Amino acid sequence: MRKKIIIYTDGACSGNPGKGGWGALLMFGELNREISGYSPATTNNRMELMAAIQALEALKEPCDVDLYSDSSYLVNAIKLGWLKKWSSGGWTTASRKPVENQDLWKKILQLIKLHNVTFHKVKGHSDNEYNNRCDYLARQAIKNNR
């Protein structure tokens, strides 16, 4: 039986593009693990995707995952089927332009084949303590690398 994991993720950017950070909180029962990272030149969307990638890569075995993000870009790409359309349509958008952040989307595609991931949208910068913690981790990653 697969372990059930709850993940919260967030990304931040100082300037867009600019210096970026991401943060994630992984919860398994009573155990919590926080991870974060930094990029010197990036976008907010790349940091949102990176948070999800790094969190899923931190899992040591295939798991059932509920992943919570305030990123409509991330959640909608999965829930509205954009990612499937992009991957089966030669990585172009409906307007025939190349999909942005293909490298990260391809990685997410690999990871959601390994793990059973359900994506959930949460409201950012509100009263969700876990999302707020991830926002703090992402912003601290930027601050610590100035």
UniProtKB/Swiss-Prot annotation:
It catalyses: Endonucleolytic cleavage to 5'-phosphomonoester. It is an enzyme of class 3 (hydrolase). The keyword Zinc does not apply. CDD domains: RNase_HI_prokaryote_like. Its cofactor is Mg(2+). Its EC number is 3.1.26.4. It comes from the Bacteria. PROSITE patterns: RNASE_H_1. Monomer. This is Ribonuclease H. It comes from Prosthecochloris aestuarii (strain DSM 271 / SK 413).
